Swiss-Prot record:
Residues 72-140, 262-322 form the ACT domain. It comes from Mus musculus (Mouse). GO terms for molecular function: identical protein binding. This is Cytosolic arginine sensor for mTORC1 subunit 2. Belongs to the GATS family. The lineage of its organism: Eukaryota, Metazoa, Chordata, Craniata, Vertebrata.
């Protein structure tokens, strides 16, 4: 297995819902007019609380500096696990549960905080740039570590060090944050960038102007329904995470879906905003899923974390996580 350190230097930011009009000029450019910007990594996720933006340095320049833009105090690097060589775009997604033991748990054991972004194509593990020497040292026994430089994949220079580095004891990691599962059913999909103009106005509506208005056809007493939509444009590949009601607004022939048409249910992690310093949150969730061999997507946002699991597994997942939660008492 190879671990690729991508060349994007990323910022993670949050915009309050009511402040999004201040940023739509830049966000529309990043999402729909990529030829007009040098940005290669852009992700926008709307939750009930806010919009989370993950963007590279070039894309960050498209956003106005504003007191309404909260930015995490670090530059982040994206790591990508690739099986059998190639890049994320040409390989099959491995899934967050498959890297739980090899990547997520070892980093948690070393108190290295991670920020996850699963897309239709792959899973990105974001780590603080300043933590990279610890990351490479922790994972060098499991992976061939390669770095992308000017688009070429080269052997990573040995950033490792052993001074003060203690082999951790494997620890039990009970789930310590409150969990909830909205009633929405989600799909994870993509579309050909060439067809983006055909759905651009619809996407703009969904991203900025729908204001969480529920589909009138949806049950009006559905109080467990939340607003969640994620759009990523990374190295020319589009990924979309949306609920079924939103999906039904799109021409079906334009969206890629799995042959099984699989739908996903969400587990939201966190009662209070989680912050960026606590380690092991992703591991607490992904390790029980890995043990049960349940595939998952995982999307961290500025305030909360979100795991998506196959619809038919949701009750078992909630049970397994609740058992883990009980273990903390």
């Amino acid at each position: 297995m190879e671990l690729h350190i991508l060349e994007h230097r990323l910022q993670v930011a949050s915009v309050a819902k009511e402040s999004i009009p201040l940023f739509t000029y830049g966000l529309i450019k990043l999402a729909f007019l990529s030829s007009k910007t040098r940005c290669k990594f852009f992700s926008l996720t709307e939750t009930p609380e806010d919009y989370t933006i993950i963007v590279d340095e070039e894309g960050f320049l498209e956003l106005p500096s504003s007191e309404h833009l909260s930015v995490a105090d670090a530059t982040w690097l994206a790591l990508n696990v690739v099986s059998g060589g190639g890049s994320f775009s040409s390989s099959q997604p491995i899934g967050v549960t498959k890297i739980a033991k090899s990547v997520i748990a070892p980093l948690a054991d070393q108190n290295i905080s991670v920020f996850m972004l699963s897309t239709y194509q792959t899973d990105f593990i974001l780590v603080r740039e300043r933590d990279l020497p610890f990351v490479t040292h922790t994972l060098s026994s499991e992976f061939t570590i390669l770095r992308v430089v000017n688009g070429e994949t080269v052997a990573a220079e040995n950033l490792s060090f052993t001074n003060g580095f203690v082999k951790p004891k494997m620890v039990q990691r009970p789930v310590i944050h409150p969990l909830s599962s909205p009633s929405n059913r989600f799909c994870v999909t993509s579309l050909d960038p060439d067809t983006l103009p055909a759905v651009a106005t619809l996407l703009m509506d969904v991203m900025f102007y729908s204001n969480g208005v529920k589909d009138p056809m949806a049950a009006s007493d559905d109080c467990g329904h939340i607003r969640f939509f994620s759009f990523s444009l990374i190295e020319g590949y589009i990924s979309l995470v949306m609920d079924v009601q939103t999906q039904q607004r799109f021409p079906s022939h334009l969206l890629f879906t799995s042959a099984s048409g699989e739908l996903w249910k969400m587990v939201r992690i966190g009662g209070q905003p989680l912050g960026f310093d606590e380690c092991g949150i992703v591991a607490q969730i992904s390790e029980p899923l890995a043990a049960a061999d349940i595939p998952a997507y995982y999307i961290s946002t500025f305030k909360f974390d979100h795991a998506l699991v196959p619809e038919e597994n949701i009750s078992g997942v909630i049970h397994a996580l609740k058992v883990s939660q009980a273990g903390k008492h």
